[in-house]
């Protein structure tokens, strides 16, 4: 990540229960924001939230951010690009309606992986229904992990506009996503400006944090590289950190979001995945170093000094009183986890999850 060590999280606004931060110090071409709100925190900390509620949990924060962007004159006429089916979890149309932002058109794209000899050979657009709104703001909601789908679809859309002699003013992305998104969008901006020099760039809004993806199977041996999100190497909203560490288990989940599509539409698959994860951890608990697992989830080896902790979390511009409280809370959390074994934690989660979502479990 270019200049990542120099990046700091800077408070932008705190209104209507939504806290917003922007990234500074990275010398980026684009704007990057992190927003935090009670419902989106609940979504990412509670895999028991499924179905329509997954969508509903993002409405308030999305609306408030669009209000801010409208006030900043960053968005006028919107053209929503719905990348199927991940986009269906993001309430962009509803949020625009609430904030009196005119949605001119909604375009649809679907891309699928192409396999050759059981290996991914690339991506192919399977369905396309594009509408062109010259000089508009393109809006996208998508999970960005590896970012391959996003790159593929954005190139397809910009080519479509160019073929019709039109251009886009800017692109706004709402995402539950990772650090790779920043690298990708910085490169894409340079690419787009070669043919649209006036392109204003991307405004990317991350819910609750800019996470990172595992690059291996992790300490537990169950994680999927370039798929599963965790805190390490990312930037987490202070409010999300506070809430996550006020509860016993959320930080130990396999992924911060799991499979967004399954969580919304194939709920039984999501239930099976979460139960399989915790059953696997329960079976292998005695082979997993609990301290090492906790350090991995927090993002650094502990103990860590307050000064190093602030730097590791990019919190230099967070109010010192708030940062110190968060640091003390984390120390308390680490201490409290010494009183529970990983097996006990796994059994507790299996029980909680089964009780909450029993109606979705297929025998």
Predicted regions and their residues:
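PRPP-associated nucleotide enzymes
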Residues: 1-363
